[in-house]
Amino acid sequence: MAGHSKWANIKHKKAAQDAKRGKIFTRLIKEITVAARLGGGDPGSNPRLRLAMDKAFGHNMPKDNVERAIKRGCGELEGVNYEEIRYEGYGVSGAAVMVDCMTDNRTRTVADVRHAFTKHGGNLGTDGSVSYLFTHCGQLLFAPDIDEARLLEVALNAGAEDVIDNDDGSLEVITSPDTFVAVRDELEKAAFKAELAEVTWKPENEILLQGDDAAKMQKLLDALEDIDDVQDVYTTAVLDI
């Protein structure tokens, strides 16, 4: 169950992200700005900022855009003061959904998030209602047909917590948030390039949705992703579409 459709779901996620590249830039600029505001403008001493910058450059964001976002976060340039908020709720068949936002207007954001849940058969819950169902961790996903033994050796020596062999043949490396960058860098030095590499909230248990239920859940997730203030959406649902 843990590995069901993992590879297909990741490919779908990547395709959806590529289709929304303009929005990704906006989200990354927000993340860089907030990371710099909270932890300073030096990526060497601010892991959150380094991750955001790595992701931005991975999406070919111009260096000038990144530097301006850092300066806004550090107060060197004027900019919007974003607030981080998390909303929790339920989708189809009780699948848990967690929505991380950055906003300059909390009232607008909660209204938009609640509307998306209500319109697509879900409901917005209270703080803490589903967050306990997820673990904060680093996640790196590798395509099937790679050297599993070598990857396992490099990952564990670099400080990875686990390597999961999914049913579809893909390999998943799990790290703590703090060791994610070190593990990723060591794997890249050994020529292992992840198809997906991120610090995320991984569900403890997944719920498989198929047919109409999967289609309905996809509409809810898409509606949440389309909200301007939404940064990330996490769910316990695995969609078999």
Curated annotation (Swiss-Prot):
GO cellular component, one term: cytosol
Transmembrane regions: none
Cystine connections: none
A Gene Ontology BP annotation from the UniProt entry: regulation of DNA-templated transcription
Protein name as annotated: Probable transcriptional regulatory protein Neut_0281
Organism of origin: Nitrosomonas eutropha (strain DSM 101675 / C91 / Nm57)
Keyword annotations: Cytoplasm, DNA-binding, Transcription, Transcription regulation
Domain of life: Bacteria
Family that this chain belongs to: Belongs to the TACO1 family.
Subcellular location: Cytoplasm
One of the record's GO molecular function terms: DNA binding
Pfam family, one: TACO1_YebC_N
